[in-house]
């Protein structure tokens, strides 16, 4: 249960963290956000925030796109996050949601001459996709919004309506998740997750120029695949039909973590079950994020003093 929020420059009870119905971001989607995972390590009795600095670096880049000016550095944002999590006292996996937004209370679509603000809360959070052996995905009829319309490299609140359209279409049609194409028909990503394929032992993922989020988990997977598993990783455009001939496939992201894809458009991906390469990647990733791999321990920020 969430008890606190960072709001208007201080940590307050969650009930006090309220915005006006006239709030600009509430009316026009003029905000940006991050999702940051914190992982409970039972053996060490420690909560580790994973890759906090890269998330806040990306948040500040999103702020630049929306002309939002925050009075906080990456270091200060990280300190506030640890303080909030300590106050919450979580002894389980958690998810932190920082939001930067246009806080003026007025009517009028624009980014300039508006007040900016920042808020943050955290919630206990488990798996985003529950199926251990793999999700059932469908190629969506909704296309990813192009960079020169609403840039996907920014986590902009209003742009996630595009993700919501594809996700809900998939679920209403009996699937777990959507795969979205670009305007020219190449594979972009999931509704709100990056995507990888495995073909002939090679890991393949769309480049960041295919209107995808510049995923922090995506970059971590690429590093682990190359340096720890010795895999060849190709960042290149992916045709739709490659989805149907892939040996394995998976979604990745802070929320979804690493989630295998068992079927696409009701066609089995490989054996239709969790494949060996995805399993290796997933197992290694979860060991890293819980602070169990010494080489990557510096990416994990402890919450509780020892």
State what each model feature region is:
Residues 1-83, 106-306:
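Helix-start/capping segments and mature chain N-termini
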Residues 103:
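Active-site loop/lid in soluble adenylation, ligation, and acyl-transfer enzymes
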Residues 86-90:
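Non-catalytic accessory segments adjacent to catalytic cores
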Residues 93-100:
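ATP-grasp fold ATP-binding core
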